[in-house]
Regions:
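Short gly/ser/thr-rich secondary-structure transition/capping motifs
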Residues: 20-29, 85-88, 136-139, 159-164, ...
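ATP-dependent carboxylate-amine ligase
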Residues: 1-15, 41, 129, 191, ...
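Short beta-strands and strand-loop turn motifs
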Residues: 14, 69-70, 100-103, 180-186, ...
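Phosphate-binding loop of NTP-binding sites
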Residues: 6-12, 87-215, 219, 223-232, ...
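N-terminal leader/targeting and accessory segments in enzymes
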Residues: 1-89, 373, 378, 382-391, ...
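Acidic, Mg2+-coordinating active-site environments of NTP-dependent enzymes
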Residues: 68-72, 180-319, 348, 373-376, ...
C-alpha cells in the first residue's frame, strides 16, 4: 500500500486538521494491533471488542497513524465518523489509483475454488493477487485490496454474503471488470426469505460493474429476474453458452471437455462440480489473453485452499475424502454424487460421515431430510450421522439400510457425543475402505480427520 497520511485523510474526509502531522509514507493497513509494524495505518474496527481500546498498543508497535472515531491524544490520527466506512473508501480509492483489473467471484458453492483456479490461470501471464483465506466480507475485501503487492495487474476477489445487500456493497467498492456467480444454493438460508432472495443477493455482484462488463451466471431459472440488461451475460450449464461436453471422473482427478475448448483439460482434483469451476475459470482466462496451452499446463500444478474437497490417508491405510470446510444441501448432494461415482477400492467398502449443515433457518430439518435421496445402500455400506438437525435423516436412513449400518451421535447444548463418534468411525473403518466426511465447519469434522490421520490424537 503506497499512500501517505495526508492522502488518506483527504480520501476519507478527515474531520480534524492532519496538516500538523508529518505526511509520512504508509506501508500497510492493519485492524489487529498485534500485527502492526513500523509505518502502518491502524484501523480500529468495532466488533466483539472495540479496536479503539488498542490504539495505544498499535503505536507501541510502530503505527504511523490511526483512523479514529474520537480524538486521540499524543499521536497522529485521522478523525472519521465511521472507521469501517473510511476503510472501505480507502480501498475503493486505491483500486482506482492502481487501475488494477478486478475479477469478482461469488456463489453458494465453488466460489473459493473458482477464485483459486482463476488466479492460478491469470498468474501464468500477469502479476496476480487473490483473496487470502476467507477474507471475503465488508472487512476482508478492503483488507485484501490494501494488501495487494505493488504492481499487481489482476486482482481476484471472493465475495460472500450473510444478508441481502452485502454483495452490493462489495461490488460498488471493487468495481469488477468481470464477475462470476458460480451457483445459487441454500447457504445462509437462515438470513434470507428463500432461495430467490439468495439469488437476488448473489446477482448484486453486477451492481458495481460498468456497462458491457462480463458477467458469468449459471443456467438456472432462479437468476433470470436478476440478470442485468446492460452487461455482457454468459450462461453456463447444460445447453447454455458454456457447457461440459465430456467428463471422466477418477478417485483423485478428472478430465473434461467444454464446447469452447479445442482439447480436453486434466485436473488433479475430484468432483464434477470442479470441472464446472475449471470451465468458468478457463473461459475468463481466455478472454484475458491466456492461451489454452497455458491453461492446460497450469491446471497440472493446481493448488486449492485447504479443506476444500481433498483426499487424505488414515493411519490404517484407508482413503479419506475430506470436505469439512462448509456445508449446505447443494454441496452435500454434489459431494455424495462424486463419492458414489468413484469406484470402491478392491476389498473395501464406502462409509459416509455426515454432520449438521448450519444456517438453514426454519427449513433446516426438512432440507437435511431431503439428503435421503442421495443415500443408497447399494453404494454406501455405512452412514454415520452427527449433529442435531440431522437426527431425523438418521432415522430415515436406518429404515433404508441394513441393521447395524447406520449410526447417530448427538451434538447439542446439553450433550456432545463427539468422542463416541470418533470411536465408532475408527471401529468401522477398514484398511481398504474409503470414507467421506462432510459437514459445516462448526461441527469440527476437521478434528475427526486429524484423528484418523494421526492415531495418537
Amino acid at each position: 500500500m503506497k499512500l501517505t497520511i495526508h492522502e488518506v485523510a483527504q480520501v476519507v474526509g478527515a474531520k480534524n486538521d492532519v496538516s500538523i502531522f508529518d505526511d509520512a509514507q504508509l506501508e500497510n493497513a492493519e485492524f489487529d494491533s498485534r500485527l502492526i509494524a513500523a509505518g502502518d495505518l491502524f484501523v480500529p474496527l468495532k466488533g466483539a471488542r472495540d479496536g479503539h481500546d488498542f490504539i495505544e498498543t498499535a503505536f507501541e508497535n510502530g503505527a504511523a497513524v490511526t483512523l479514529s472515531e474520537k480524538e486521540v491524544a499524543n499521536h497522529p490520527y485521522i478523525l472519521v465518523d465511521d472507521v469501517l466506512t473510511a476503510f472501505q473508501q480507502l480501498a475503493a480509492y486505491y483500486l482506482e489509483k492502481t487501475t488494477v483489473d478486478v475479477f469478482a467471484v461469488t456463489g453458494s458453492n465453488g466460489k473459493t475454488t473458482t477464485k483459486d483456479m482463476l488466479a492460478h490461470l491469470l498468474s501464468t501471464t500477469y502479476k496476480t493477487y487473490k483473496t487470502q483465506g476467507n477474507y471475503n466480507n465488508e472487512i476482508g475485501l478492503p483488507y485484501t485490496v490494501l494488501h495487494m503487492p505493488e504492481g499487481t495487474e489482476k486482482l481476484v476477489l471472493e465475495m460472500g454474503q450473510d444478508h441481502l445487500g452485502d454483495i452490493h456493497v462489495l461490488s460498488e467498492l471493487a468495481r469488477p471488470k468481470t464477475a462470476i456467480v458460480t451457483l445459487v444454493g441454500e447457504a445462509h438460508l437462515a438470513f434470507f426469505k428463500d432461495r430467490s432472495e439468495i439469488a437476488k443477493g448473489k446477482m448484486q455482484i453486477a451492481d458495481g460493474m460498468s456497462s458491457n462488463s462480463l458477467l458469468l451466471a449459471p443456467a438456472d431459472p432462479i437468476v433470470e429476474d436478476y440478470l442485468p440488461a446492460d452487461k455482457k451475460v454468459v450462461r453456463f450449464g447444460q445447453g447454455a453458452d458454456l457447457e461440459i461436453t465430456d467428463l471422466v471422473e477418477r478417485k483423485d482427478s478428472l478430465t473434461f471437455k467444454a464446447n469452447f475448448l479445442e482439447q480436453e483439460l486434466d485436473l488433479p482434483v475430484t468432483g464434477k462440480y470442479n470441472a464446472t469451476n475449471a470451465m468458468i475459470a478457463s473461459y475468463v482466462a481466455l478472454q484475458e489473453g491466456v492461451s489454452e496451452e497455458q491453461i492446460r499446463q497450469a491446471f497440472r500444478d493446481l493448488e486449492l485452499t485447504r479443506n476444500r474437497t481433498e483426499w487424505k490417508k488414515a493411519t490404517n491405510g484407508a482413503d479419506i475424502l475430506s470436505d469439512v470446510y462448509n456445508a449446505n444441501p447443494t454441496a452435500m448432494k454434489l459431494i455424495l454424487e462424486t463419492f458414489s461415482a468413484i469406484p470402491a477400492n478392491e476389498g473395501g467398502k464406502k462409509i459416509a460421515v455426515l454432520a449438521d449443515m448450519k444456517e438453514l433457518g426454519d427449513q433446516s430439518i426438512q432440507l437435511h431430510n431431503q439428503m435421503i435421496l442421495s443415500l443408497s445402500p447399494d453404494v454406501l455400506d455405512t452412514v454415520i450421522f452427527y449433529g442435531e438437525d440431522i437426527a431425523e435423516l438418521a432415522q430415515l436412513a436406518s429404515q433404508m439400510f441394513p441393521i447395524g449400518h447406520v449410526y447417530y451421535f448427538k451434538k447439542a447444548e446439553d450433550q456432545d457425543q463427539f468422542e463416541d463418534l470418533v470411536k465408532q468411525v475408527k471401529e468401522s473403518l477398514g484398511v481398504n475402505d474409503q470414507i467421506l466426511l462432510k459437514g459445516s465447519n462448526s461441527m469440527n469434522l476437521a478434528k475427526l480427520v486429524e484423528s484418523l490421520e494421526n492415531e495418537d490424537k
